[in-house]
Every structure is written in structure tokens, then in C-alpha cells.
């Protein structure tokens, strides 16, 4: 069996990635989220596949087909609730995974980091088109508002929006193509995740100290497989608790009403995981400026490796940068809260302040703190 595991062309790849992989001996529970994201993706693809068997991508039938899944399909309610709340778990793990990457300096593996940012964009696109499918009020108006942002692009904006809609408004053709995108994109994510892993295994994992761990490595199995199973058990427990006891806690009540183009909901807002970006978008009064700020809020992740000024990789021994990191985290919580509030004072000014602070910490304060810490470490004699 050992020979087969180590010599068979296909098994060898699996063995080198998940069994005999040399891993640093000191990686903490923050390194669990990669495997949790993989499990989330598989869960979403499986539950999504069963939902797609019963879903009808037609404006007259979409809402009813989702109700039919919940009422008449065996365990349809559970599959639907697992899929909807699975998206929330996915983003929770994703944001913690990115946060860990920033805190411990994992972004210095540039190829892995860049593929990760592309993955983030793809997951966000998938979640957005998926949210439109139940064809409730918030689905319809969310699709209308977000696709309309492209009309801010000079010259080609309006044409581009109508091209995406497949008509002069969000309608049947929009829903059909969004369903097609939502079906294909998870497989693109799967392919990108494999490339992400490929680049990671070129260098090996980083560790909390940020020091080269080559002198002290242990096999991935059984040490980290057991550790990952613990994280997985906790995540599945939280997901099942959500799906079974309060499946609608993270959703929007407006989505229980079928889409009505003649009636606009009082507060159009996306799911909780997009609220921080939505707050940044709304904090700029100009439409094009808002769209650019929205893009910049995610694209700025690509600049983080270039803004690294410290001699140390991790924030473990850098108290000033640590403080800034936690201020940034608190700022993102504030932005998430503001994104769910109506556009009125004092929310407008809080959102604008939080948006400025977000960019300021990443572009100016963190690099300055790195330089200061580097200076403080220089011998003064």
C-alpha cells in the first residue's frame, strides 16, 4: 500500500499534497482555514448540484421553485439552508484566512497571494450571481443596483450594462445567464484553488514566527489532518446549528417577497459579507468614484506585498503594526455595520471616516510603522 501511495502517478500527487507534505511544527489553528475553505467549496458544489436539479431559472417560476424545494423535496429545506448559510461560512473562513495572511506575512509568497486575491474576486462574483437566483425582492433590486454600477464606465457603460442584462432591464435573460454563471464559476474556483495549492507547495507553508521553518518540519499526516478534523467538526457544527435552528438569521426579510420591478424596497443592501465594500462604495458621492473605491478596497490586497517595509515577516514581534492591524479589523467591523444602515447622518460621516481610515492604514500607516520598527531595531552604538 505504501508503495502504491508513493509510486502511483495519481496517488503520488495526493500523497505529496496531503500526507507526506513537510509542514512547520509550530503552525497554529489559524492555518486551519485553508482546509476549511476546501471543505466549504465541496459542500457548496454538492448542495448546489442538488438544488440545481429542482431549480427553474425563469422569472415566473424561480421563486416558486425555491419554495417547492423547501416544501416538497426530501430534505430540500436542509439542502437549501445548508447552501445559503454555507456561503456565510465560506466568507467567514475566507476573511479569517486573509486576515491570517496579513498578520503573519504570508503575502510575501507573492504567487500564492495573487492567486488568492483572484480567488476572492471569483468567490464574490459567484456569491453575487447566486443571490439573484431565488428572485425575491432583494435579489432583483440587488442585481439591478450592482449591475447598474457598470454604467459609470465612460462611453461604454450603458451598452455594457444592457449587454449583461440581455435587454433593457433585469429580466428573464439576466436570470438565465446568472444561473449559468453560478453553475460554472465554482468549478473555476476549484481549478484556481488547485493552482493556489500548487504555488503554496512550491515554497511550503509560512509559520507564526515568520522565520524559515526548514530546519524543523513534521509530516502533514497525522499531525495536521487530526488538527484540521477538529476545525472541520466545529465548522460543521456551527453550520448545522445555523441551518437547522435559525436559517434566516443572516438573510434579508425582503427576499421572502417575490421580485416586483414596480416596488423598490426601502433599504437595498447586500448580504453581510459584502457590506464593508458596499459602505465604501456609498461613502463617495460620485458614482464613478464610488465604483473605483469599491474595486480599490479589494484590489489593494495586491499591493500589500509591495508595501511591506519591515525586516520581520510576521507581526508577532511588532507591537505597533499589531495595533494598526487590530484597528483595521475594528474599522472593517464599523464599515460592515454602516453598510447595513440607511444613507443619513450620522451614518454617512461615520462611513466616510471609516473608508478613509481603511485606505490610510494599509497604504500609509502600516508601511510607516514597518520603517519605524526597522529603525528601532538598529543598534544605536
From Swiss-Prot:
Transmembrane segments: 33-53, 77-98, 113-133, 178-198, 226-246, 288-308, 320-340, 347-367
Residues binding a ubiquinone: 201
Cofactor note: Binds 2 heme b groups non-covalently.
Keyword Mitochondrion: yes
GO biological-process terms attached to the record: mitochondrial electron transport, ubiquinol to cytochrome c
Binding site for heme b b562: 83, 182
Organism domain of life: Eukaryota
Membrane topology field: Multi-pass membrane protein
GO molecular function: metal ion binding; ubiquinol-cytochrome-c reductase activity
A Pfam family reported for this protein in Swiss-Prot or TrEMBL: Cytochrom_B_C
Cofactor(s) the protein needs: heme b
Positions of heme b b566 binding: 97, 196
Keywords: Electron transport, Heme, Iron, Membrane, Metal-binding, Mitochondrion, Mitochondrion inner membrane, Respiratory chain, Transmembrane, Transmembrane helix, Transport, Ubiquinone
One annotated Gene Ontology cellular component of this protein: mitochondrial inner membrane
Location in or out of the cell: Mitochondrion inner membrane
Binding partners and assembly: The cytochrome bc1 complex contains 11 subunits: 3 respiratory subunits (MT-CYB, CYC1 and UQCRFS1), 2 core proteins (UQCRC1 and UQCRC2) and 6 low-molecular weight proteins (UQCRH/QCR6, UQCRB/QCR7, UQCRQ/QCR8, UQCR10/QCR9, UQCR11/QCR10 and a cleavage product of UQCRFS1). This cytochrome bc1 complex then forms a dimer.
Family: Belongs to the cytochrome b family.
Other remarks in the entry: Heme 1 (or BL or b562) is low-potential and absorbs at about 562 nm, and heme 2 (or BH or b566) is high-potential and absorbs at about 566 nm.
Function: Component of the ubiquinol-cytochrome c reductase complex (complex III or cytochrome b-c1 complex) that is part of the mitochondrial respiratory chain. The b-c1 complex mediates electron transfer from ubiquinol to cytochrome c. Contributes to the generation of a proton gradient across the mitochondrial membrane that is then used for ATP synthesis.
Record protein name field: Cytochrome b
Encoding gene, per UniProt annotation: MT-CYB
Amino acid at each position: 500500500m505504501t508503495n502504491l501511495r508513493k509510486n502511483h502517478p495519481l496517488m503520488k500527487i495526493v500523497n505529496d499534497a496531503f500526507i507526506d507534505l513537510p509542514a512547520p511544527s509550530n503552525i497554529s489553528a489559524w492555518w486551519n482555514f485553508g482546509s476549511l475553505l476546501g471543505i466549504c467549496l465541496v459542500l457548496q458544489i454538492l448542495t448546489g448540484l442538488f438544488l440545481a436539479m429542482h431549480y427553474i431559472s425563469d422569472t415566473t417560476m424561480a421563486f416558486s421553485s425555491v419554495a417547492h424545494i423547501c416544501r416538497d423535496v426530501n430534505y430540500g429545506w436542509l439542502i437549501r439552508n445548508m447552501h445559503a448559510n454555507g456561503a456565510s461560512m465560506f466568507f467567514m473562513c475566507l476573511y479569517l484566512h486573509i486576515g491570517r495572511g496579513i498578520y503573519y506575512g504570508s503575502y510575501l509568497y507573492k504567487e500564492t497571494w495573487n492567486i488568492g486575491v483572484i480567488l476572492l474576486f471569483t468567490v464574490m462574483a459567484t456569491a453575487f450571481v447566486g443571490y439573484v437566483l431565488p428572485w425575491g425582492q432583494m435579489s432583483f433590486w440587488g442585481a439591478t443596483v450592482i449591475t447598474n454600477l457598470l454604467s459609470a464606465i465612460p462611453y461604454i457603460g450603458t451598452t455594457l450594462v444592457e449587454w449583461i442584462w440581455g435587454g433593457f432591464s433585469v429580466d428573464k435573460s439576466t436570470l438565465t445567464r446568472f444561473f449559468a454563471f453560478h453553475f460554472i464559476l465554482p468549478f473555476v474556483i476549484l481549478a484556481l484553488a488547485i493552482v493556489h495549492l500548487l504555488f503554496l507547495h512550491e515554497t511550503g507553508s509560512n509559520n507564526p514566527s515568520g522565520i524559515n521553518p526548514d530546519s524543523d518540519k513534521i509530516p502533514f499526516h497525522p499531525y495536521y489532518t487530526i488538527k484540521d478534523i477538529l476545525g472541520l467538526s466545529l465548522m460543521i457544527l456551527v453550520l448545522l446549528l445555523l441551518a437547522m435552528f435559525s436559517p434566516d438569521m443572516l438573510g434579508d426579510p425582503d427576499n421572502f417577497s417575490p421580485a416586483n420591478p414596480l416596488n423598490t424596497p426601502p433599504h437595498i443592501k447586500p448580504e453581510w459579507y459584502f457590506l464593508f465594500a458596499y459602505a465604501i462604495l456609498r461613502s463617495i458621492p460620485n458614482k464613478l468614484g464610488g465604483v473605483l473605491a469599491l474595486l480599490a478596497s479589494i484590489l489593494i490586497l495586491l499591493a500589500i506585498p509591495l508595501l511591506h517595509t519591515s525586516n520581520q515577516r510576521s507581526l508577532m514581534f511588532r507591537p505597533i503594526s499589531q495595533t494598526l492591524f487590530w484597528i483595521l479589523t475594528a474599522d472593517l467591523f464599523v464599515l460592515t455595520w454602516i453598510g447595513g444602515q440607511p444613507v443619513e447622518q450620522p451614518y454617512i460621516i461615520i462611513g466616510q471616516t471609516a473608508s478613509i481610515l481603511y485606505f490610510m492604514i494599509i497604504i500609509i500607516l502600516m508601511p510607516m510603522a514597518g520603517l519605524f520598527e526597522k529603525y528601532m531595531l538598529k543598534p544605536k552604538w
